[in-house]
């Protein structure tokens, strides 16, 4: 591979396992900046499994380690203690077709559980799990896909997401509360993408359709009111 930002390009060689070749063996280790000790988290990563994501939960003594097999239809998530190395399986999903690894970055660890987006019912939907990995409820459901999970307000137990429930060629922004009451937040028909403030009181929305170039606005969540236009590409 040739790359570089300098006057002359450099050459870098790395292993890329092609079909039929063995995957590299991987392992997870924690390092103490105080004692300078290294400890291996001996989670099962055998055969054709690899580690697509490692992240801390809201508990500083709890590391989430995620594994996928090469076929990407068996997903495991372990909770491991970086001090002791003790781990336990917290979530496992087997799909006869495919587990979308892109959704793993959308897992949110809450004070009392975590969220997980899965296609286990045939469509991409948001699920809420307990701290021990027991599914508490399916947050969204229907014959349509959640296309982006935008966050959850733990104070109000409200979930925010983007979906294609109106049409496969449109994207809209919604919120849904603990009782399952759903509210559409985007007001324009077409493609909407939103980024919410930390307290979910406001969101920046990027909207476009076949006849409208991208328009970026700041909106108030409660009233859906457009507060300010950040960018308008209209002629």
Ranges and model annotations:
Residues 1, 25-27, 41, 50-55, ...:
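Non-catalytic accessory segments flanking enzyme active sites
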Residues 1-22, 68-70, 163-165:
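Short, conserved, GDST-rich strand-edge loop motifs in beta-rich repeat architectures
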Residues 20-24, 70-74, 119-124, 165-170, ...:
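Short, solvent-exposed loop/turn segments at conserved positions within beta-propeller repeat blades
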Residues 26-33, 78-85, 128-131, 174-177, ...:
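Beta-propeller blade signature
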Residues 33-43:
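A short helix->beta-strand "capping" segment at the edge of beta-propeller domains
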Residues 59-61, 111-112, 155-157, 201:
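Short coil/turn segments that connect the beta-strands within blades of beta-propeller domains
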Residues 89, 99, 106-118, 128:
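Large, well-folded core regions of big proteins
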